[in-house]
Amino acid sequence: MRHRVAHRKFSRTSAHRMSMLLNLCISLIKHERISTTLPKAKEIRPYVEKLITIGKVYKEKNLVYGKRLLISKIKNPDIADKLIGILSVRYKSRNGGYTRIIKNGFRKGDSAPMAIIELVDRQIITVESNKNS
């Protein structure tokens, strides 16, 4: 029975697991959309949501402590700046639910269930091609 088991282990040591989840969180915040396996996407969702909420709270209070807290958690000052500067403004009126998980079939090599995890309300840039045929 799996009573009181909070997180997935992914067959890794705890240091490797935390490093992997941290890298996935940083990639998601940086690119705003990543493709990964479904269990990994489900596992990083609460971490990313908490990071965005921390950025929102400390942006409103205008405290330096918030940026230091984010840097201590994610070890990347550029991502902390993006959380406080861009994402906290984008999600100012939203109370949670900053991410979306879309199932994306199965991986060809090992049939692992794949998913796309993305930040909602993101700017989608479209490139129009000039066809003069």
From Swiss-Prot:
InterPro entries: Ribosomal_bL17, Ribosomal_bL17_CS, Ribosomal_bL17_sf
GO molecular function: structural constituent of ribosome
Gene Ontology biological process terms in this record: translation
Keyword Transferase among record annotations: no
PROSITE patterns: RIBOSOMAL_L17
Any single GO CC term annotated in Swiss-Prot or TrEMBL for this entry: cytosolic large ribosomal subunit
Keyword terms: Ribonucleoprotein, Ribosomal protein
Superkingdom to which the source organism belongs: Bacteria
Gene3D superfamilies recorded: Ribosomal protein L17
Family annotation (Pfam families): Ribosomal_L17 (PF01196)
Ribosomal protein recorded as keyword: yes
NCBIfam families: L17
Family: Belongs to the bacterial ribosomal protein bL17 family.
Subunit structure and binding partners: Part of the 50S ribosomal subunit. Contacts protein L32.
Name assigned to this protein: Large ribosomal subunit protein bL17
Gene: rplQ
